[in-house]
Amino acid sequence: MKLLNAALLGLFIASTAFTSFSDEKKTATAEHLQNVSVTIRSEGSFSNGEGSGVVFTRKDSKGNLVNFVWTAAHVIDNLRKERKAVINGSPKTIVEFKDPMVVKEIRQGGRTVGRLQMDAEVLKYSDADDGHDLALLRIRKFNFVKDTVTFHLGDEIPNLGDDLLHVGSLLGQMGANSMTDGIYSQHGRLIKSLNKHVFDQTTCTAFPGSSGGGVYKKGNAHYIGMLVRGAGEGFNLIVPVRRMKDYCEEHKIMWALDPKVEMPSEAELKKMPIENTPKEKEDSDAEKEAAKKLFPYMLRVTYPKVLIMKEMKQND
């Protein structure tokens, strides 16, 4: 009897220890994903956009922490401007971007205790309609955060049914990120109306403000894709990290995903084109508008009060 009681006690202690470990891991994962997640705010001339992003941190040659941010291109497309210039006697179209704002909320003891916000420059941009819907930013201040995301860079594709987590800025709540869970419900979705790009599918709940937010494997918190569009509860589309790898390899920026790849110098970064020559458009404008209705962006859009007041006066 004593042996049985001792055995039962041992099982209870082991079970409690396992549960505690699981809870600790869950808490650590949630804290880590909160630390690498940010809100992206874009203040354009006619509208403001609010979405999400994830921080990838590198060290430069001087030991400074350089914080890069991946987000969806459609989150910042209202900041894009073109101007004409004559360079060496030839007319050129110059593409420029106003700085988006990266917002990070500081929480302690279960409550918000402050907020950090920094300007970021746009380093790379591949538009949503005819490109990959990806944007790479660099926060202008060194050492903004020390945390960094880990990308799933292996060749294996996660299995259908794998547990996933998504972190995004609910309704653009400016730095306080919400976490949802779901499963990997499908991969390799080839959607003609979305320029025949491959998307993966998840049941993780998304909301306006989720665009650009990371989707992660629940077991190790590795980033497996970026949430960009939704078509109803339980049906959301992500740009898989393997597509991001293809884009980075094509444009020689694997250093923005893989910490083992040497980071370019400041001079080399300045020479890097923000946009590369887009491929020939395959879809009509009507098809693109239809796609936006079927699979809308998970972006929160607001309008400046001045613009609203002007429209109201015009309608009087």
Q: What is the predicted function of each stretch?
A:
Residues 58-127, 242:
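Catalytic-histidine neighborhood of serine endopeptidases
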Residues 24-28, 80-106, 171-172, 223-316:
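C-terminal cap/linker of serine protease catalytic domains
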Residues 25-26, 37-70, 179, 212:
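A conserved glycine-rich beta-strand in the N-terminal activation segment of trypsin-fold
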Residues 23-28, 124-128, 146-198, 205-211, ...:
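Flexible, gly/ser-rich surface segments that form the specificity/activation loops bordering the active-site cleft
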Residues 31-45, 164, 305:
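A short, Trp-centered hydrophobic/proline-enriched beta-strand micro-motif
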Residues 54-55, 205-227:
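Catalytic nucleophile loop of clan PA
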Residues 7-16:
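Bacterial N-terminal signal peptides
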Residues 53-55, 122, 184:
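Conserved hydrophobic positions within beta-strands
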